[in-house]
């Protein structure tokens, strides 16, 4: 599995050859989307498939601004069709490597790319149970659900006529399936839950929280108290000290045990480690315990295998309780 969970916004993953498709980072993404990923329950009726863009995240591109103006209901689930990742759900577009890969956008697909995308879409549709698929990607699909193609052959996806056709198809689906246009912060809560499931395998820690603040760094609040903040540039949540006990009790973050009797000061070094998960990733948030007591949090600077008998600094401290 990939050894890094988060990277700086400047980092790029270059996909300029077919061999890049074999990279563990790519195969891990495809496997998870293909077999595990589920959208929020609020977005499981209508799926719209959109083409990718050279600019990442996609929503910052001109073409996707056109698409989003045509998709006027937030209950419609947007998924971007791309290579080599196959599919990128809108709520995951700020994740590594979806926000960082660099590939020439030619509009031409080889048979392997098409086969991968068609398989992934079919698996996603069958697993989620969408009632209708609106296909604006330009790729043909043979699905066991009603599919509406909104791009005429040879017509650009972001052209005025194509976007009008897309908007008509969306509006028709909204009316036919009586889709409620959920509020922005309600949608954000659903999307943060999906992001939490993707990153941590659970969203229990945020179930009682609500979204506040202003874009792009939204806050997750308990009443008026900030518990977490979303950082879109790095695709991560930052947690406040007061949330650590809940993150621990819900099993959200991996746990590292350190030894010694002196007060914990500074960062975490190899000589301090009693135990650590073997699958830790660079950039991953971890909880720190001593003698079965939670004492703080840190951010991993090394992959899990380096924690087993390695040397040097392994994690940067974040909070102390």
Predicted regions and their residues:
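Short connector loops at secondary-structure junctions
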Residues: 76-100
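Extended, charge-rich low-complexity interaction segments
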Residues: 99-133, 178-205
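Peripheral docking tails and interdomain loops at the edges
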Residues: 139-185
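Anionic-ligand-binding alpha/beta catalytic cores of soluble enzymes and soluble regulatory domains
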Residues: 175-252
């Amino acid at each position: 599995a990939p050894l890094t969970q988060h990277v700086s916004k400047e980092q790029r993953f270059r996909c300029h050859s077919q061999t890049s498709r074999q990279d563990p980072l790519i195969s891990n993404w495809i496997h998870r989307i293909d077999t595990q990923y589920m959208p929020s329950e609020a977005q499981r009726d209508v799926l719209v498939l959109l083409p990718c863009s050279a600019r990442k995240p996609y929503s910052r591109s001109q073409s996707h601004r056109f698409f989003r103006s045509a998709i006027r209901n937030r209950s419609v689930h947007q998924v971007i069709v791309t290579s080599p990742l196959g599919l990128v759900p809108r709520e995951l577009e700020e994740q590594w490597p979806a926000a960082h890969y660099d590939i020439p956008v030619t509009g031409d697909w080889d048979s392997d790319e098409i086969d991968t995308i068609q398989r992934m879409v079919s698996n996603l549709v069958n697993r989620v149970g969408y009632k209708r698929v609106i296909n604006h990607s330009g790729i043909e699909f043979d699905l066991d659900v009603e599919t509406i193609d909104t791009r005429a052959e040879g017509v650009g996806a972001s052209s005025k006529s194509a976007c009008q056709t897309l908007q008509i198809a969306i509006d028709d689906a909204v009316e036919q399936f009586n889709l409620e246009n959920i509020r922005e912060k309600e949608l954000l809560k659903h999307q943060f839950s999906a992001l939490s499931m993707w990153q941590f395998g659970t969203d229990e820690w945020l179930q009682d929280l609500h979204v506040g603040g202003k874009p792009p760094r939204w806050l997750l609040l308990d009443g008026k108290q900030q518990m977490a903040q979303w950082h879109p540039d790095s695709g991560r949540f930052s947690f406040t000290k007061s949330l650590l006990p809940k993150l621990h009790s819900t099993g959200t973050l991996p746990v590292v045990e350190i030894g010694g009797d002196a007060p914990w000061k500074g960062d975490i070094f190899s000589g301090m480690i009693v135990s650590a998960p073997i699958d830790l990733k660079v950039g991953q948030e971890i909880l720190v315990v001593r003698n079965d007591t939670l004492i703080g949090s840190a951010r991993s600077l090394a992959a899990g295998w380096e924690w087993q008998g390695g040397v040097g600094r392994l994690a940067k401290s974040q909070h102390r309780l």
